[in-house]
Amino acid sequence: MQATENKEKVVYWGTGRRKSAVARVRLVPGSGEIIVNKKPGNIYFNRIPDYLQAIKGPLETLGLENDYDILVNAHGGGLTGQADAVKLGVARALCELAPENRPPLKAEGYLTRDPRAKERKKYGLHKARKAPQYSKR
């Protein structure tokens, strides 16, 4: 039997989190397409250009915006949290691609995980910090 040459594409993985959103990101050599949960990025993010611009940010910093396709599996949270999670995942995948990508991405703040999350509700209060109305008499 004749051996067939299998040219596998090299895939780079990165995981991003923001609020309660988690995004598992794959960078595959391609033309700059963004696919989120098997849908084109502009349809998934309701054609909101700010989200797509944020996702492409790490690639634009390195001048690679048309060299890799971004394949994403995102769940949890809302669109803003998912977009920021994807951005962090892309940046981490680019660090896996080449270690010399790390300093420019870190300088731009793409490798920093935003720690802000919803504060839990406390008993005796209406919300996390909103107290019931105080009556002096």
From Swiss-Prot:
Q: Name one GO biological process term.
A: translation
| Cellular-component GO terms for this entry | cytosolic small ribosomal subunit
> Which InterPro entries does this UniProt record tie to the protein?
Ribosomal_Su5_D2-typ_SF (IPR020568), Ribosomal_uS9 (IPR000754), Ribosomal_uS9_bac/plastid (IPR023035), Ribosomal_uS9_CS (IPR020574), Ribsml_uS5_D2-typ_fold_subgr (IPR014721)
Molecular function, one GO term: structural constituent of ribosome
Q: Which residues form a coiled coil?
A: none
A Pfam family of the record is Ribosomal_S9
Q: Where is the composition biased (Basic residues)?
A: 118-137
Q: Where is this region: Disordered?
A: 103-137
PANTHER family xrefs: RIBOSOMAL PROTEIN S9, SMALL RIBOSOMAL SUBUNIT PROTEIN US9M
Q: Which family does it belong to?
A: Belongs to the universal ribosomal protein uS9 family.
The name this protein carries in UniProt is Small ribosomal subunit protein uS9
Which organism does this sequence originate in?
Answer: Crocosphaera subtropica (strain ATCC 51142 / BH68)
Which gene does this sequence derive from? Answer: rpsI
